[in-house]
Structures are given as C-alpha cells and as structure tokens.
Amino acid sequence: MPAGVNFTSPQRTATDVQFLADRTFTVDGERQTQQQIFDTVFEMIANARHIVLVDMFLFNDYLGKGSEQHIPLSDELSNALIAQKKRYPDLQIHVISDPINSLYGGLPSKHFVELKAAGIPVTQTDLTQLRDSNPAYSGFWRLLIQPFGNSEGGWLPNPFGEGQVSVRSYLNLLNFKANHRKLLIADNGSELTALVTSANPHDGSSAHGNVALRFNGPAAWDLLESEKAMLALSGKALAEVALPQKAENTDSNLSVQVVTENAVEQASLAMINQAKSGDKLDMAMFYLSDRDIVEALKSAQTRGVVLRVLLDPNKDAFGRQKNGIPNRPVAHELTQAGIIVRWCDTHGEQCHAKWLMHRGAGETTMLLGSTNFTRRNLHNLNLETSVIVKGPANAAPFRRGRSWFDERWHNLYGRHYSVDYENYADERRWPQLLYRSMEATGLSTF
C-alpha cells in the first residue's frame, strides 16, 4: 500500500460539528429536492483566506442517459474556486480528483482546464499506485495496455456523455479502481475547517440523497495530513499552511476521528460488534456487500440489537437500469436473519449515503463519508475517507442524524422516501450466486 493510506487519526475533541443532508423525496407523486451540502461547501470556499483543498471523485457535468432535472454542481464548484482565487491571489487552492473525469486521459475535462488556467493546480490521482481490485483483468492491462498510455480522441462514444474516446479509455475503466474520496478542507480566516461527505460535484448525481459532516479543530488538521499523502502518491506536495493550529477544546463532549480505507471497515465492525442487547443500530447504505459486515449485522441481530437497515434498491444509474446487485441479494439474507430492511423508493436518483449510527446506553457513535460497505471500498483497494463522531445522544449532530434517518424510514411530514422490503425483494438463487462471485473476485462495479 502507498504511504499514508489506511489512516486512523486520534479521537479529537471538536466544538462545531454539523450534520448535513441532501434530501430527495416525492409529495403527491412529484419529486422534490432539498440540499445543504454544497451550499455549505460554497460558503466554506468563500470564507477561505489561506487554504482550500478539494478531493472529489466525480467532478464533471456528464448526465449519462439521465434526463431528470439536475443542478450544475460541477460548474458551480469550479466557478466558486476560480472566483475565490481571483479575490485572493495568494490563497493556496488544490483540487484532487479521479482520472475518470478525463476518461483516463482520453477526453479533456473542461473544468480542470479552466481551473489550471486560473492558476489552480489539479491532481488526477495516479491509480497505478493502488492495488488491483479486479486482478483477473488488471494483470493483462498492466502488461499490455498501461505501457502505451492513452491519447485524446478516438472512435468510441464517451460512456458518460458527449465526445469520443479511444479503446484504451474503456480498457482503463475495466480496472475498477478509483480515488473515491469526497471532502473539502478550508480555513475560515482563523482556523481550519473540514467537510467529509458522500456527495460528488457531479451534475448527474445532483439529485442523489447524501450526507456530510462539517467540523473544525485538530481533526481537520488530521484530515489535511491524510490528503498530503494523496498528493505525494501522485508526486505532488502542499505548501506550508500559514495558520496556527489551535489546541483541542477539552471542554467539548464530542470527538471526531478520521478513518480511511480499511480503517473504515475496522471502525464499522467495532461499532456493530460492540452493540449490546437493546442497543439501536441504524444503517443507510448505497452498496452493502462486504461479507464481514453482513455477518456482523446478523450476529448483532442474534444478540438482541435493534437493527434498521435502509438500502438503495440498486435499480438506477444515470438513466440506466441496474439488476439490483448487490443490495437485493444481501437484503434477502438479512431479512432471513430477522433484520428489518426497507428500500429507498428512488425515481432516477440514488440513495447514495454511507451512514451508520450506534446508540448505546452511555454513548452514541456515528460514521459517515465516501465509503460503501463493499470489498472494493473497505479492503485497501479504492481510496476512501470517512469520519466517526462520538458523544452523548442529545448532541446536535446525533439529533439531526436520527431525525434524518427517521424521516426517511417512516416517510414523515407528508414526504415519501421509502417502501417495505417486499417492494423490491429478489429472492431468486442466481442473483445471490452472482453477487457472491462478483464480491469475491472483483469482477463488478461495486
């Protein structure tokens, strides 16, 4: 593994911890959207004077085959960064993203071109430094394709939008590896603040349901350290940030901890395995397939933990229909074990959150971020970042997190979010076998 990956920070006290959510729901059959996450991102950028670091997986305006209404998040983020750089020319801004946005060198990203022209460096992560998540294919690719690089243009259609790309863009895509992180670090003039999320500045994803955590203090500096490692992985570096590090506020009863890659799995398993009879464990997840997590949930049910699992039905992907794998076979397995599962009732958008909350007798723990609960996301293959918050149950981020989950689970306030398990159940044998095979071998997109 590259240096700095699989990172676990200390637990840091924090005073300004905010839970944020983007909601999509229907009222009388009409889809509506409420968004908080990128409003907060733009506010953080506007307040920055010393440093802005953006690390986002999807940063483009591609819609795929989707025709639903969307928000031009990619333009809005690019414009916000360029405008702030013009206001404060000495402001240090870095953008880190995944090379999927340029089709692995096959099609220039207009946003990256504009950012570079404004004096903002853009680092597309060197994915060749990462372990292969699809080893049956990647050996062939490394030997026969990688040495020849890629070139712009070609005769094949762009799989995500307009333009044409080479066959090598498609062959690169089949490695199924990514910098999947989604975060922002910025100062507010006096201290460092950070935001970790499941949301992308991607127009085709702008209606997705997502969550985020905004926080300040030493945990934000820990996140910055983990991002320095991401720059180093691609041969880049961050200049010194001219901002004093404030001491931890020992009066706070909340702690924030940064975890990346496999450290997310270890933290998640600890949350589930430590839950006792009568404790409450709630999960909202876009992809759930990791066998260790699934078995831990079943064991928690046996111990008497009260579980609620809200899953995306895996039927929509930017205008394309999906086959329900992995979530529908996994949901069948969970319901067979007695766990209550509900589905997000999506209409083109995705239920994209990656969120887990444990409520025990003395302390509440919440985990959220970029990390789906799959082998590829949890086993040091993709690059991922999540955060863990711990503290008393009545603390504001936990109240808001519970309210967000309950609203979706119970369809509160006249808003329709979710349906019973039976609505999207698939109990056929072949999807279960296919899911197990795809999860084990890496021959999958999840």
Feature roles, as predicted:
Residues 1-446:
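Charged, low-complexity intrinsically disordered terminal segments
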